[in-house]
Design a protein with these regions (language model features):
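Extracytoplasmic/periplasmic, Sec-exported soluble proteins
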Residues: 10-14, 24-31, 46, 50, ...
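Acidic/His-rich structured neighborhood in mature extracellular/periplasmic domains
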Residues: 56-179, 185
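TPR/TPR-like alpha-solenoid helical repeat scaffolds
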Residues: 78-115, 191-203, 245-255, 266-274
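Short solvent-exposed coil/turn linkers within tandem alpha-helical repeat scaffolds
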Residues: 45-49, 133-139, 181-192, 232-243
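N-terminal mature-domain "stem" immediately C-terminal to a signal peptide or N-terminal signal-anchor/transmembrane
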Residues: 1-67
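Extracytoplasmic/secreted envelope proteins and their assembly/folding machinery
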Residues: 16-19, 36, 175-182, 191, ...
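Flexible, glycine-rich surface segments
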Residues: 153-220, 224
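A cross-kingdom marker for long, charged
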Residues: 203, 215-292
């Protein structure tokens, strides 16, 4: 009776060979759309550890080549056509790009794992982590959580032109997600990037931005934001975010909610207690993380 011949699963050594082949292709600066497709083809059948390595190679490629991808979109005729589109940009708008060469350039950019964004009258590419999440079922739990964290920002950036462009609720959600990643996967190779994202979000939340200050009239913290802080401190008291929010609330209680004032020269300065909190926020947050 004839028997069916089964194809053996890929061995660790064959997986490693594929990873090295992919790494060589990335180092040779293959076009992003070709490289992303190669990654998906080569990842088929790979185990989580090997799949993670493919993602890391792809991310390193993006870090190296993002500026070059941006330069390809900087030609005046390209910018003019892209700025005519509705923003935020969606792929169904491709047909609205009149110039065929510009349309093909944008199609290749999107196929390479980028998405388009705009600020200060310029269009530029950003890495679309949501496209890397397409392979989320193949990678490890830690890598999938990392890609999900990074996709929050690539799906909807948190800040633009020194101003917060998401809600305080969404910012808190992202801050807690970044903290949770570091606490859950402290030894992950992606830990440092997640930690830096946590610090960035935490500073936005507790110190504001140039064009989104946390204070209003009389240099006092915005009442609605203080209420938000109080809710965060209670609901997330076991987190670093919640504990540092409580520390800020304690300071506000001693300053009458003031975070700044005018000195004798009429210059705006932070009150001493709040200034000390701002200056030490990053070091305190990092020190509270595991392995710091």
């Amino acid at each position: 009776m004839p028997t069916e011949t089964l194809t053996p699963p890929p061995s660790p050594s064959s997986d490693q060979t594929l990873i090295e082949q992919f790494r060589a292709k990335a180092l040779a600066d293959a076009p992003a759309h070709e490289l992303l497709q190669s990654m998906r083809d080569m990842m088929a059948g790979a185990g989580p550890a090997q799949a993670d390595e493919f993602i890391r190679v792809m991310e390193s490629y993006y870090e190296k080549n993002l500026n070059e991808a941006a330069e390809r979109l900087q030609a005046e005729n390209v910018q003019q056509q892209l700025l005519k589109l509705s923003w935020p940009f969606t792929e169904d708008q491709l047909t609205g790009i009149e110039d065929k060469s510009v349309r093909m350039l944008v199609e290749q950019t999107l196929a390479g794992g980028y998405k388009l964004d705009t600020a200060e009258g310029m269009v530029f590419p950003v890495v679309d982590y949501g496209k890397l999440l397409i392979n989320g079922e193949q990678v490890s739990t830690a890598m999938k959580a990392y890609l999900s964290l990074m996709a929050m920002e690539s799906d909807a950036r948190s800040a633009s032109d020194a101003a917060l462009v998401i809600t305080w609720d969404e910012l808190t959600k992202r801050t807690l997600a970044a903290e949770s990643y570091v606490m859950t996967f402290p030894d992950s190779p992606e830990r440092q990037k997640a930690e830096d994202r946590f610090i960035q979000y935490l500073q936005y939340y507790l110190t504001g931005m140039d064009n989104t200050p946390i204070f209003g009239t009389g240099y006092k913290v915005l009442p609605d934001l203080k209420t938000h802080y109080e809710q965060t401190a209670v609901a997330h008291s076991g987190t670093i975010t919640g504990q540092l929010t409580r520390e800020l609330l304690d300071i506000l209680n001693t300053t009458g909610d003031a975070v700044a004032a005018k000195n004798k020269n009429g210059d705006e300065v932070y009150v001493a207690e709040y200034a000390a909190f701002r200056d030490s926020l990053e070091s305190k947050a990092r020190a509270a993380l595991p392995g710091s």
